[in-house]
């Protein structure tokens, strides 16, 4: 009896310690994140599941000199809280640092009056709205609708997190220079014709950073609008789809791909 009690206690302690380590890891070191839109194609695809290094940037200040932190660098693929809706996480590429002068002319980005060499940039035709989001939803009597700059909510549920993201004015030139404020950063999607980013809603505060995208640990072929559907039934359908098609729809060649 005493032996069984000891085993039970050891098991309980192991579970508690494991949970504490997991909580610490996801809070301070690494966290999972999935790609819901095509704004970073073709570097990151819808259905890519990432591990995000939350430790790399850390806190700026005196203590950072003694820890393996580093400052965000131009070209980093970062995950951050969307400034207009902080509970939503975005992933973009860091283009402008604090104090930089940013100009976008056509398809060329100028940083401090010099054109930026962007080998990772794509210009992919976004297609029609039906290709992205399926049939239109016509609100019925009694629905509560909130229309924001980059989202439409019906009864508290986001129908499309990035309506504007898929259809920015592709011919627009941003002739007015943008000066990145202190402790803020300018971020853009690699898929420039299909990205709602700092060109539209401004810079990202440093304290909104969640981390640097590190690796694709799993990639699953996913319909373009599936991750934007967040209802309970929608999530259940997603899980069933993964179980049924795990082997046939997993993008095996993207597994464990380092994000650059």
Name each model-derived stretch:
Residues 1-260:
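Extended hydrophobic leader/signal-anchor segments used for secretion and membrane insertion
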């Amino acid at each position: 009896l005493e032996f069984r009690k000891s085993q039970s206690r050891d098991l309980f302690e192991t579970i508690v310690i494991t949970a504490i380590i997991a909580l610490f890891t996801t809070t301070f070191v690494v966290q999972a994140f999935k790609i819901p839109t095509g704004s970073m194609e073709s570097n990151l695809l819808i259905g890519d599941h990432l591990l995000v290094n939350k430790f790399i940037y850390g806190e700026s200040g005196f203590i950072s000199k003694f820890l393996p932190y580093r400052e965000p660098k131009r070209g980093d693929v970062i995950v951050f809280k969307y400034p207009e809706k902080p509970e939503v996480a975005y992933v973009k590429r860091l283009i402008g640092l604090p104090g930089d002068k940013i100009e976008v002319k056509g398809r060329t980005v100028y940083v401090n009056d010099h054109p930026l060499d962007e080998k990772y940039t794509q210009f992919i035709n976004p297609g029609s709205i039906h290709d992205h989001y399926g049939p239109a939803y016509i609100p019925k009597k009694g629905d509560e609708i909130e229309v924001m700059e980059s989202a439409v909510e019906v009864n508290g549920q986001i129908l499309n997190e990035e309506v504007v993201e898929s259809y920015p004015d592709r011919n627009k030139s941003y002739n007015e220079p943008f000066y990145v404020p202190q402790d803020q950063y300018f971020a853009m999607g690699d898929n420039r014709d299909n990205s709602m980013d700092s060109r539209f809603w401004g810079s990202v505060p440093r304290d909104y950073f969640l981390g640097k995208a590190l690796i694709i640990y799993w990639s699953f072929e996913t319909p373009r609008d599936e991750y934007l559907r967040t209802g309970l039934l929608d999530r259940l359908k997603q899980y069933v789809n993964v179980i049924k098609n795990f082997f046939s729809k997993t993008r095996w060649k993207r597994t464990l791909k380092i994000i650059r």
